[in-house]
A protein has these predicted regions:
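Conserved catalytic/ligand-binding micro-motifs in nucleotide and anionic cofactor chemistry
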Residues: 1-13, 17-325
Length: 325
């Protein structure tokens, strides 16, 4: 479930989630807890409230939602998730009629298949944009030397840009890796490091987008995981939103629970933009639960092909993704 530390003014100071609420809350009051910020919080705490949930994944999602809604002062993460930028192909306007790569915090749902992100900050988004722009050449290049990555040095066609943003990231990755190798051979290590960092920003955003796209494209998806004590955990996801969850008893037939969850789960209309109904953090959390090893897809409404990954997925470049900033 979810727990809240509250002040005398009934302000929520901190929100957390745990499998065993009693044990987790008790741990804050032991000698093992050394964090100064926690000690300060406990000095002003007058009560602890909890909300029980049928599954841990629902508790984690509720925790994210409460942090976004209540903005507790002691929680350091999950702040302002809806203001994180995406990289997409923007249509030109005014004096700039040609399409261009741009960052946006308002991404229409129908564009999620052709955008990458979200980025943790606008600065990282700009670094990823520079990496892509140096190859795709849709705008004026502001770099120096090694300007010609494309053999013809002409702007990419919009279709090629969309392909890069929707699963063929090697259109950018391959030329940039060649550039980084050339800089290293020339012993220009600082420049090679700069381009590696830019490529890493891009690949991490692509990897993040590839994880959440399947759930954002599904009007209804139900998945199941075996419980250690027996039985199943069932989760319903609609348009990237947790619509409901439940468990089944050990040895019980799970099919009635599947039917019950399908009919009792929250009704979710397709949102007009990404993040309108659920934060990307929520969708990412659900993607980790639904799509990783150990989960079984029970049912999917719509085209099941949305659950596939492109052959050229960003996860292929594990060395770049795993490298440090």
């Amino acid at each position: 479930g979810v727990y809240q530390f509250r002040s005398a003014a009934d302000q929520v100071l901190y929100v957390g989630s745990a499998v065993d609420l009693k044990r987790r809350v008790r741990s804050y009051f032991t000698a093992a807890e050394k964090r100064r910020q926690v000690a300060q919080m406990l000095d002003t705490t007058v009560s602890v409230r909890h909300i029980a949930t049928p599954t841990l994944i629902e508790a984690r999602v509720r925790e994210l939602r409460m942090i976004a809604e209540l903005d507790p002062p002691v929680n350091r993460r999950s702040r302002a998730p809806r203001r994180r930028p995406w990289l997409h192909l923007a249509q030109g306007s005014g004096s700039r009629a040609d399409p261009r790569l741009a960052l946006t915090t308002v991404l229409p749902t129908e564009e999620v298949g052709h955008a990458v992100g979200p980025f943790a900050s606008r600065g990282r988004g700009q670094e990823a944009l520079r990496a892509a722009e140096s190859v795709l050449r849709l705008g004026r290049w502001d770099g120096r030397e090694l300007r010609r990555v494309r053999h013809d040095d002409v702007p990419a066609e919009p279709a090629e840009v969309l392909a890069c943003l929707s699963g063929e990231v090697d259109l950018v990755t391959a030329p940039l890796l060649e550039r980084i190798a050339a800089l290293s051979r020339a012993e220009r290590y600082e420049e090679a490091g700069t381009w590696t960092a830019r490529l890493r920003c891009l690949l991490r955003a692509v990897d993040r987008a590839e994880r959440v796209r399947p759930l954002l494209a599904c009007p209804h998806l139900m998945a199941a995981r075996r419980r250690e004590v027996g039985g199943w955990e069932l989760v319903a996801v609609r348009w990237g939103v947790l619509a409901g969850s439940m468990t089944t008893a050990p040895g019980a037939d799970p099919r009635p629970a599947v039917e019950l969850l399908r009919t009792s789960a929250r009704v979710v209309d397709r949102p007009g933009r990404v993040g309108e109904v659920a934060s990307i953090e929520e969708t990412s959390l659900l993607a980790d639960w639904v799509l990783d090893e150990g989960a079984r897809i029970v049912e999917v409404d719509g085209d099941p092909a949305v659950l596939t990954w492109p052959i050229g997925a960003a996860a292929r470049h594990r060395k770049v993704l795993a490298s440090q900033e």
